[in-house]
UniProtKB/Swiss-Prot annotation:
Substrate binds at W40, M41, N42, E43, Q59, W67, F99, T100, R175, D176, E233. One of its GO terms (molecular function) is sucrose alpha-glucosidase activity. InterPro entries: ConA-like_dom_sf (IPR013320), Glyco_hydro_32 (IPR001362), Glyco_hydro_32_C (IPR013189), Glyco_hydro_32_N (IPR013148), Glyco_hydro_beta-prop_sf (IPR023296). This is Extracellular endo-inulinase inuB. Residues 1-25 form the signal peptide. It catalyses: Endohydrolysis of (2->1)-beta-D-fructosidic linkages in inulin. It holds the Pfam family Glyco_hydro_32N. Glycans are attached at N109, N372, N419, N424. It is found in: Secreted. The lineage of its organism: Eukaryota, Fungi, Dikarya, Ascomycota, Pezizomycotina.
Length: 516
């Protein structure tokens, strides 16, 4: 769970309803991004696939449109796009709120909470006692394939006093358990974040219930990590193939509260080795470790228990860094569109690369395509297209000194502009005139990411547009910028232009996206 003082949260409800398929124009509701029908959600929790069903849990206030009364909301999907709301999975009760955590399958029933014929699914979460403001680690389990969850009677499984020797606040700042089974050592591993202490701690267990501290990963032990990156929260950890090498590496993903490229919180990932007790980080490169250069991609986690036949590492985050400030009245926040995370060499550097899940193609329809066409200064293409839910793909060869601009959600006085500036190889999102930016000092501005042409001089940009968001993927997905926007309904135009030189458009595909 993110620190209540860190304003980067969103919302969702826990009712068994169907996700609205069209934006509610009076409240900026997105068309194809996950949101609840009312109230508050922060980051996703316990992402897991059970059979053919994807489970999404999330931090949720079921009674108000602000942070508080935090439980685990729950929704399910068979395609990661059409979601059905389910009842609250882990409730806020007896003065203990259910903060962030993760889920995992216990196939050998090492926890003893199921049986050999029906092994349990387990969920670990931070218990936050409101009266004392203390945090401890707790366990819940499901023996009906994730439909309902029961809190372990022996909670907490790691008490504040057990955390205290490893936490300078005496255990008050230990949270967000990431738990997985480490087949190499035969132990269960828990990774805990220690907020303002800028460290993670690693614990082991043979039975998922009794835990022993093993080591800490501190900022000072990571070569190249800036001391300005503070407030570590929401850890994830997994092995990831390095494409083209036949090798894998361990990855730790987390959300610092400060120090991101766009200012404030953001998600970074580092590679390293893990021996079952200690994670040793590789030296980091500040230009490649951030997964998103926008303002609105926070608290990312990945789905687990995904079959090897699928093979994808799919992540999602909450899109909101402004607490309760965004100008929505019945909800706060939304889930980023699910994206794959890979690790590969791009040019001379190893990069984390991300792309929207391919399932998006099944709910989109091409509106206009262009191919092998030169665009020159003074021309405007795509101006006949209107839409607030789009998937726009542009691949082009820019002239030296040129700037290619894709303008989305364009109106009489509003627009969000995605630029590629050839001279400094920079991808940017300009929210200066994107609509309502009065709600927060950080709501406007320009966010940038480095994006080099490929070996042939080609630049590729993909933009997911929804009612109140843009997610921009550059190149193979090595440059990503995700931002909230709040334009008027009538600002639904599109434009493709170039200045400072020509650009040869290899391909353009504008697709309309609909869950119907």
């Amino acid at each position: 769970m993110l620190n209540p003082k860190v304003a980067y949260m969103v919302w969702m409800t826990c009712l068994g309803l169907t996700l609205p398929s069209q934006a509610q124009s009076n409240d900026y509701r997105p068309s194809y991004h996950f949101t609840p029908d009312q109230y508050w959600m922060n980051e996703p929790n316990g992402l897991i696939k059970i059979g053919s069903t994807w489970h999404l849990f999330f931090q949720h206030n079921p009674t108000a449109n602000v942070w508080g009364n935090i439980c685990w909301g729950h929704a399910t999907s068979t395609d990661l796009m059409h979601w059905a709301y389910k009842p609250t999975a882990i409730a806020d009760e007896n003065g203990v709120e259910a903060f962030t955590g993760t889920a995992y399958y216990d196939p050998n029933n090492t926890s003893g909470l199921g049986d050999s014929a029906n092994p349990p699914y387990l969920a670990w979460f931070t218990g936050y006692t409101t009266s004392s403001q203390t945090q401890d680690q707790r366990l819940a389990f499901s023996v009906d394939n994730g439909a309902t969850w029961t809190k372990f009677q022996g909670n907490p499984i790691i008490s504040t006093s057990q955390e205290a020797p490893h936490d300078i606040t005496g255990g008050l700042e230990s949270r967000d358990p990431k738990v997985f089974f480490h087949r190499q050592s035969g132990n269960w591993i828990m990774v805990l974040a220690h907020g303002g202490q800028d460290k993670l701690s690693f614990w082991t267990s043979a039975d998922t219930i009794h835990w022993t501290w093993q080591s800490d990963l501190k900022s000072t032990s990571i070569n190249g990590l800036s001391s300005d990156i503070t407030g570590w929260e929401v850890p994830d950890m997994f092995e990831l193939p390095v494409e083209g090498t036949g090798e894998t590496t361990w990855v730790v993903m987390m959300t610092p509260a400060e120090g991101s490229p766009a200012g404030g919180n953001g998600v970074l990932a580092i590679t390293g080795s893990f021996d079952g007790k200690t994670f040793t980080a590789d030296p980091v490169d500040a230009s490649t470790m951030w997964l998103d250069n926008g303002r609105d991609f926070d608290g990312a986690l990945s789905w687990v228990n995904v079959p090897a036949s699928d093979g994808r590492r799919i992540i999602a985050a909450v899109m909101n860094s402004y607490g309760s400030n965004p100008p929505t009245t019945t909800w706060k926040g939304m889930l980023s569109f699910p994206r794959t995370l890979s690790l590969k060499k791009v040019g001379t550097q190893q990069h984390f690369v991300q792309q929207p899940i391919t399932e998006l193609d099944t709910i989109s329809t091409s509106m206009q395509t262009l191919a092998n066409q030169t665009i020159t200064p003074g021309q405007t293409l795509l101006s006949s297209i209107r839409g607030t839910a789009l998937d726009v793909r542009v691949a082009f060869y820019p002239d030296a000194g040129s700037v290619l601009s894709l303008t989305v959600r364009k109106g009489a006085s509003e627009q969000t502009v995605i630029n590629y500036t050839q001279s400094n190889a920079t991808l940017s999102v300009d929210r200066t005139e994107s609509g309502d930016i009065s709600y927060d000092p950080a709501a406007g501005g320009v966010h940038t990411a480095k994006l080099e042409e490929d070996g042939t001089g080609l630049v590729s940009i993909r933009v997911l547009v929804d009612t109140c968001s843009v997610e921009v993927f550059g190149g193979q997905g090595e440059a990503v910028i995700s931002d909230l926007i709040f334009p008027s309904d009538s600002s639904d135009g599109l434009a493709l232009e170039v200045t400072g030189g020509n650009a040869v458009l290899q391909s353009v595909d504008v697709r309309s996206v609909s869950l119907e």
